[in-house]
UniProtKB/Swiss-Prot annotation:
NAD keyword on record: no
Lineage per the UniProt record: Eukaryota, Viridiplantae, Streptophyta, Embryophyta, Tracheophyta
Keywords, comma-separated and alphabetical: Chloroplast, Membrane, Photosynthesis, Photosystem II, Plastid, Reaction center, Thylakoid, Transmembrane, Transmembrane helix
PANTHER family with a match to the protein in the record: PHOTOSYSTEM II REACTION CENTER PROTEIN M
Superkingdom of the organism of origin: Eukaryota
Family that this chain belongs to: Belongs to the PsbM family.
Protein name: Photosystem II reaction center protein M
Binding partners and assembly: PSII is composed of 1 copy each of membrane proteins PsbA, PsbB, PsbC, PsbD, PsbE, PsbF, PsbH, PsbI, PsbJ, PsbK, PsbL, PsbM, PsbT, PsbX, PsbY, PsbZ, Psb30/Ycf12, at least 3 peripheral proteins of the oxygen-evolving complex and a large number of cofactors. It forms dimeric complexes.
Cellular component aspect of the GO annotation: chloroplast thylakoid membrane; photosystem II
InterPro entries xrefs: PSII_PsbM (IPR007826), PSII_PsbM_sf (IPR037269)
Transmembrane region(s): 5-25
Main location: plastid
Compartmental location: Plastid, Chloroplast thylakoid membrane
Protein's organism: Daucus carota (Wild carrot)
Pfam family, one: PsbM
């Protein structure tokens, strides 16, 4: 069974892109909350 490189890349992007997007939003909200508390 051969591993399709394009399918592997597509799967990786499909997982990494939303994860990175959520991380960026999380970090932004965390920094804003810390600034508001101070």
């Amino acid at each position: 069974m051969e591993v399709n490189i394009l399918a592997f890349i597509a799967t990786a992007l499909f997982i990494l892109v939303p994860t990175a997007f959520l991380l960026i939003i999380y970090v932004k909200t965390e920094t804003q909350n810390k600034n508001k508390k101070d």
